Amino acid sequence: MNKHHIMPPRDADPNRPSWMRLCAWSAFFATLPSGVWRVLMIVGFMPGTADFRTFQLAGEPTLGYVYVFGLSIVQVTCGYLAVGLIRPWGEHLGQWRIPARLPVFLGAVGSLALIWIFNVQMVAQVALGHRPDAGLIHNWALAVMLWCYLPILLWGPLTLATVWGYWQCRAHENSEAYPRGETSSP
């Protein structure tokens, strides 16, 4: 087989700048620590969080488990969608090319929502003395929780940067595809 005809792996990064790849993967990884912490807490594997676990499971425990597991799954899945902006599966569904405006719109709205939720609301609530754990976690267990939740502050800004890079790359690709002044929206 001639080495010049070898195709790159189907899941190889397309021609995206390294800063964009770093932002996309970092956005995804920013979702993992709090998601893992939350699951470990709810199943009782996180020492020092028994009171908070009891608080979370008060009322109907099944709903508490479903909520915590569901929230963690949705969070990590949404974080992984940023990776789609640098991968082929984020630009094509089978033979259909995804219009650039769709992921740009959804990504921008999602990023701004994340920034509002975590960087504005959560930080403001903590600054006003309202702790998300209702004051039930103390000492080193509180330090572990804080370290696991700090990366979530990067999720929105990193995703927004990735969305901007995606828009720029798709606009550049379209400008190369229409060299005679013809235009197509990215």
Feature map (PLM): residue ranges:
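Hydrophobic cores of alpha-helical transmembrane segments in multi-pass inner/ER membrane proteins
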Residues: 2, 73-81, 147-163
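Perimembrane loop-to-helix junctions flanking transmembrane segments
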Residues: 48-64, 134-137
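Individual transmembrane alpha-helices with interfacial aromatic-anchor signatures
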Residues: 100-106, 135-155
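Membrane-helix interface/capping segments
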Residues: 49, 79-97
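C-terminal TM-helix exit segments that contain a strictly Trp-centered aromatic cap at the helix terminus
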Residues: 33-45, 112-128
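Interfacial helix-start motif at the membrane-water boundary
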Residues: 59-76
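Alpha-helical transmembrane segments and their helix-start/interface "positive-inside/aromatic belt" motifs
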Residues: 14-32, 100-110
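Cytosolic juxtamembrane helix at the C-terminal end of the final transmembrane segment
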Residues: 5, 9, 16, 86-94, ...
